[in-house]
Amino acid sequence: MGINMLDELKEDLVGIDIRFDEPLKRYTYTKVGGPADYLAFPRNRYELSRIVKFANKHNIPWMVLGNASNLIVRDGGIRGFVIMFDKLNGIAVNGYQVEAEAGANLIATTKVACFHSLTGFEFAAGIPGSIGGAVFMNAGAYGGEIAHILVSAQVLTKDGDIRTIDARDMRFGYRRSVLQETGEVIISAKFNLKPGDYEQIKHEMNRLNHLRELKQPLEYPSCGSVFKRPPGHFAGQLIMEANLKGHRIGGVEVSTKHAGFMVNVDQGTAKDYEDLIADVIAKVKENSGVTLEPEVRIIGDKLN
């Protein structure tokens, strides 16, 4: 970006929190990721729209990083604008419906539902990430998923406009939604829940959290579950059968606690993650004949 355009950015986007050449590993769950040219934290939809329209006007690429939980940002970073929704985190309850902005913490949203004795969101009680990412990926666990409770979502189009998509038009599948094809970005989502008993809801959330603590390597940085569940199999079991628990490349290893996770144990890099993912796919294929498909998203530029 030239000096004139930089001056225009500071003038047009005055008042918006924008950081230049900001290392993204400070914000990702994996603790890896190179710099973003411009990292923006809009406080509301108006600021978000200003950022997107400025970027489009100057042909600057832009993307929303969300909560950065189920993704890997490459070591070369991301060109253009990276937008984070940390400040777009409102949660509201209206009757049996919960509406949350895209940056709202998923776990916090389940706690709000519990506080109001609303049932249906318990499955997400321990899933890290944001509402936006959860809808984008159709997050789920223990028999529940976002598709079961979503009513509608407001999305930001590539032009910077906002429109509403009904749940029936989201084309949900296993860890999939139509947004992965359209490139539109979740702004907020509305969920339909049912009245329940507060103590029972709280007990179920605590039970699921306890299961996660027992099974998942929460003590290390990670990107969550790395692979989708292959039909008729469990990814973690296939990885164990290939004797890959504890298998390590650089600072990243297959968790010894849960083989479906890869953890950053010693200043690992995005390249370590990518190399380990590729190695695990190859060795599981050789051992079982099953080709694992990554669930985690990998974005950004490789380091030259």
UniProtKB/Swiss-Prot annotation:
Pfam families from the UniProt entry: FAD_binding_4, MurB_C
Catalytic residues as annotated in Swiss-Prot or TrEMBL: R175, S225, E295
Keyword DNA-binding: no
Gene Ontology molecular function: FAD binding; UDP-N-acetylmuramate dehydrogenase activity
PROSITE patterns the UniProt entry points to: FAD_PCMH
Gene3D superfamilies in the record: 3.30.465.10, UDP-N-acetylenolpyruvoylglucosamine reductase, C-terminal domain (3.90.78.10), Uridine Diphospho-n-acetylenolpyruvylglucosamine Reductase, domain 2 (3.30.43.10)
Enzyme class: oxidoreductase
Reaction catalysed by this enzyme: UDP-N-acetyl-alpha-D-muramate + NADP(+) = UDP-N-acetyl-3-O-(1-carboxyvinyl)-alpha-D-glucosamine + NADPH + H(+)
Pathway(s) it belongs to: Cell wall biogenesis; peptidoglycan biosynthesis
GO CC, one annotated term: cytosol
Swiss-Prot/TrEMBL cofactor(s): FAD
Key words of the record: Cell cycle, Cell division, Cell shape, Cell wall biogenesis/degradation, Cytoplasm, FAD, Flavoprotein, NADP, Oxidoreductase, Peptidoglycan synthesis
Compartments where located: Cytoplasm
UniProt cross-references to HAMAP family, sorted A to Z: MurB (MF_00037)
Function description: Cell wall formation.
Similarity comment: Belongs to the MurB family.
Name by which UniProt lists this protein: UDP-N-acetylenolpyruvoylglucosamine reductase
Taxonomic lineage from the root: Bacteria, Bacillati, Bacillota, Bacilli, Lactobacillales
Gene responsible for this protein: murB
